[in-house]
Amino acid sequence: LLSRRQRQMCIRDRIGAVAIPATNLLLKSDFEYRFKAGNVDAILCTADGPVSREVDKACRSYKNLKVKIMVGASRKGWRSFNKEVKYFSSHFRRPHGENAIHGDDPSIMFFTSGTTSYPKITTHNFKYPLGHYVTAKYWHQVDPDGIHFAISDTGWGKALWGKIYGQWLCEACIFTYDFDNFDAKEILHMIEKYKITTFCAPPTVYRVMVHLKLDQYDLSSLQNVTTAGEALNPEIFEKFKAKTGLTLMEGFGQTETTLTIGNLVGTTPKPGSMGVPTPQYDVQIMLPDGTLAGPEEEGEIVICTEDGAPNGLFMEYYGDEEKTQNAWHDGYYHTGDTAYFDEDGYLWYVGRTDDVIKSSGYRIGPFEIENEIMKLPYVLECAVTSVPDPIRGQAIKASIVLANGEEGTDKLRSEIMKSLKKNIASYKWPKILDFTKELPKTISGKIRRKEIKENDWNENEDNE
C-alpha cells in the first residue's frame, strides 16, 4: 500500500485488509524484496514520483502481484481507483462469518530498518490504534478544536503515531503538508498561517529551527510541541525554549510499539530526559546478566509482558520466528536501546545497544558526548561513533556538521577538544574530530551512526 497521504487507509481498516505502508522513494530492488518478504498480492499507490514504473520493473521477477491500483491518475496495466470507486455501493457491509475482523488479526506491517540484515517486518494487530490514544491525548495533547501538524513520511510508523489513529480517536483536525525537500522556514510559515495548535517533529527539525530568527514568526497559536525519533539534545531544548517560550516534550517508542516513554501532560520535563513510562507499558531497565537495574544503572530498555502484551505492542516479525524470539522472550520484549532511570523515575537515553562504544574496558554511550558538542554555538549536529584502535580496542570519533558557514579548521578542533576536556571525563574524549557537510540519515530523519561506523571499520580492514 502506497499513498502520499494514506486517505485510503480508512477503507483498508474497514474491510480488514493487511496494509504495508511504504514511502514513494522506493526503487525496483526495494519493491522486489518487500513483495517477496511480505507475500504481497495487491498494491495501491498515487501517481507521485516513479512508483508505478518501479513497481512494473519489480513485477518482471515477482509474479504474484494480482492487483495494481492507482489513485488520481491512470497507467496501462493498472486499475483506476477514481474511475472504479463510483461503481461500488456507498453502503458498507461489515465482513462477517469467516471474513469477520478480530482484534488479534494482523492489521498492518512495517518494514523497519535492519542493522545487520534486510529490514524486518513488524506486524501489528487491529487493536494497535487503541495504543495510540495515550500518544495523542496525553503527549501531543491534541485539541479537538485545534489543528495538529506532525512531520513524518506516511511510509513510516511515525506517521500513524502522529497523523492518524490517536488523533482520530481524539477528534483532532490533522494538517497535512507534503514537501519533497525540507525547509524549516516554510514549516514555520505554515504554523503561522494556519494557526497550528500542536506540532510534532524529529529533533533534526528543531536543530535547524534554533539557528533561525524565530521571532520573525508568529507562533502564538502553538499550545504543545513534541519530538521523537532520536534523543533530543538538552542544548536544543534550552535554545528552543529561550527563543519561543515553548517546552519541547520528548517521547520514545519504536516501530514495534506506540509511545512507550514520554514527557506527558502533568509532568515537568527534564532537559535531556525521555520522560517517564506511559501507563500502558511496564518499562524496566535490564542488566546484561538478566537482572533488573536500580536507579542510575545503565541497561537495556525492556517491556514486561508477563501479564500479557499491552495494546500497541507488535505481534511478531512476520515470517521470522527466530528474530521474534530473540527480541521477545522470558516475559520481556527487548528494545535494543540502552538507558537508565534516575531517582525520580525519569529515563535517560544512552544509545542503541550496538551504538555503545567499548574503549579500554569502559562502556561509553554516544549521546552524552554529542550533548557536550551540541552546546557549542557553531555546531549544527553531530554523531559519535567508534573506530578501531590497536591499544584501546575502540576509539571515539565525532563527526560534526557546522552551522552558518563555519569552516572546520585545526583551531576549531582545538577549541572543541578544550571544551570537551573541561566538561567530560577523559575516557570519553574523542580521538578523532571529523568535519563533514552532512550526516547520513534515514528517510524519517534519524542519524545513521551505524553507517558511519561501518564505513570506518570497513576502511580499516581495507588498509590492513
Model-derived regions: residue spans:
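Conserved structural elements of the adenylate-forming
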Residues: 87-94, 103, 122-143, 157-158, ...
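AMP-binding/adenylate-forming catalytic core of the ANL superfamily
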Residues: 26-36, 43-48, 199, 305, ...
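Single conserved hydrophobic/aromatic residue that forms the stacking wall/gate
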Residues: 1-7, 11
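Conserved pre-ATP/AMP-binding loop-to-beta segment of ANL
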Residues: 70, 76, 86-111, 118, ...
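Conserved ATP/PPi-binding loop(s) of AMP-dependent carboxylate-activating enzymes
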Residues: 280, 291-326, 364
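Conserved AMP-binding/adenylation subdomain of ANL enzymes
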Residues: 16, 130-150, 154-197, 212
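Gly/Ser/Thr-rich phosphate-binding loop
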Residues: 169, 196-201, 210-270, 282, ...
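Structural core segment of the AMP-binding/adenylate-forming
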Residues: 14-84, 195, 404
